[in-house]
Amino acid sequence: MSIEGVFREGFVTTSLDAVINWTRTGSLWPMTFGLACCAVEMIHAGCSRYDLDRFGVVFRPSPRQSDLMIVAGTLCNKMAPALRKVYDQMAEPRWVISMGSCANGGGYYHYSYSVVRGCDRIVPVDVYVPGCPPTAEALLYGIIQLQNKIKRTNTIAR
């Protein structure tokens, strides 16, 4: 079988997709976008009790170094352009986790004039973590769900 036949059958690209997705799931570098009390639980998940490092999750200070944004807390109208600007500065491929009721849909402040009713109106969201505030276990579960989503994507054969 020639090399064209191998590519036509999809074996090489499928195997390469599996390797690339495996490396991406083991090296998620989130940038913290803590806006309210959910950020405390996000910090709690990064401490020694839950240890996000064992999943390959290392917090980065710059959007240019990160591939995951965790939006944690109430997003107000004034902060929405900054969220979009930081999202646009992130390198491809990039993912977003919306953490908490306020980031998911406005939460307790849903009817306030100054609150965005969900960060998915500003940036595309991959995983929603419910709760007010969500526990560190819920954030860990959301990260595991994102890793499973990344494993299912095809990066080469589109």
Curated annotation (Swiss-Prot):
Major subcellular site: membrane
Binding site for [4Fe-4S] cluster: 37-38, 102, 132
Membrane topology type: Peripheral membrane protein
Enzyme Commission number: 7.1.1.-
Subcellular location per the Swiss-Prot or TrEMBL entry: Cell inner membrane
Pfam families: Oxidored_q6
UniProt cross-references to SUPFAM superfamilies, sorted A to Z: HydA/Nqo6-like (SSF56770)
Cofactor binding comment, as recorded: Binds 1 [4Fe-4S] cluster.
A single Gene Ontology CC term: plasma membrane
Cofactors that this protein relies on: [4Fe-4S] cluster
A GO molecular-function descriptor: 4 iron, 4 sulfur cluster binding
InterPro entries documented for this protein: NADH_UbQ_OxRdtase-like_20kDa (IPR006137), NADH_UQ_OxRdtase_20Kd_su (IPR006138)
GO-annotated biological processes: aerobic respiration; electron transport coupled proton transport
Highest rank taxon of the organism: Bacteria
The protein's enzyme class: translocase
Keyword line: 4Fe-4S, Cell inner membrane, Cell membrane, Iron, Iron-sulfur, Membrane, Metal-binding, NAD, Quinone, Translocase, Transport, Ubiquinone
Catalytic activity: a quinone + NADH + 5 H(+)(in) = a quinol + NAD(+) + 4 H(+)(out)
Entry-linked PANTHER family: NADH DEHYDROGENASE, NADH DEHYDROGENASE [UBIQUINONE] IRON-SULFUR PROTEIN 7, MITOCHONDRIAL
Subunit structure: NDH-1 is composed of 14 different subunits. Subunits NuoB, C, D, E, F, and G constitute the peripheral sector of the complex.
Known function: NDH-1 shuttles electrons from NADH, via FMN and iron-sulfur (Fe-S) centers, to quinones in the respiratory chain. Couples the redox reaction to proton translocation (for every two electrons transferred, four hydrogen ions are translocated across the cytoplasmic membrane), and thus conserves the redox energy in a proton gradient.
Family per record: Belongs to the complex I 20 kDa subunit family.
Stated name of the protein: NADH-quinone oxidoreductase subunit B 1
Organism annotation: Azoarcus sp. (strain BH72)
Gene behind the chain: nuoB1
